[in-house]
């Protein structure tokens, strides 16, 4: 009888720890998806660079707007870039040594999407 009681207490303890963690993760993912949909394929300013997001089979990928020389476009040109749907972009899934601070800006773009409160 005591064994059954201990097993029951164990499951109650586990569910009290796991279920709130799962619901918090789901809440954050929903908030990130709402932020993604609110952007509506427009670019946002992160570290004086323009970023946008694509929803792919592997999840949400950040991409930075670049000119024809692969130099990130500054935030001062956000209106021109949002109006021009034919802008070149580089995805953040690969490291770029030719662009200083590229990885840090990509990390910040992801954190701005997922961890805004």
From Swiss-Prot:
InterPro entries: Poxvirus_A21. It is a single-pass type III membrane protein. Its main location: virion. It is found in: Virion membrane. GO terms for cellular component: membrane; viral envelope; virion membrane. It holds the Pfam family Pox_A21. Part of a stable entry-fusion complex (EFC) which is at least composed of proteins OPG143, OPG147, OPG155, OPG086, OPG094, OPG107, OPG104, and OPG099. Formation of the viral membrane is necessary for the assembly of the complex. This is Virion membrane protein OPG147.
């Amino acid at each position: 009888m005591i064994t059954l009681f201990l097993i029951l207490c164990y499951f109650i303890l586990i569910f009290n720890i796991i279920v709130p963690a799962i619901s918090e993760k789901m809440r954050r993912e929903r908030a990130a998806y709402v932020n993604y949909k609110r952007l509506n394929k427009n670019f946002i300013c992160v570290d004086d660079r323009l970023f946008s997001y694509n929803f792919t089979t592997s999840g949400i990928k950040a991409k930075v707007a670049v000119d024809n020389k692969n130099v990130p476009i500054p935030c001062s040109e956000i209106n021109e870039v949002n109006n021009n749907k034919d802008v070149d972009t580089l995805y953040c899934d690969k490291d770029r040594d030719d662009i200083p601070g590229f990885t840090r800006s990509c990390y910040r773009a992801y954190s701005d999407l997922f961890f805004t409160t």
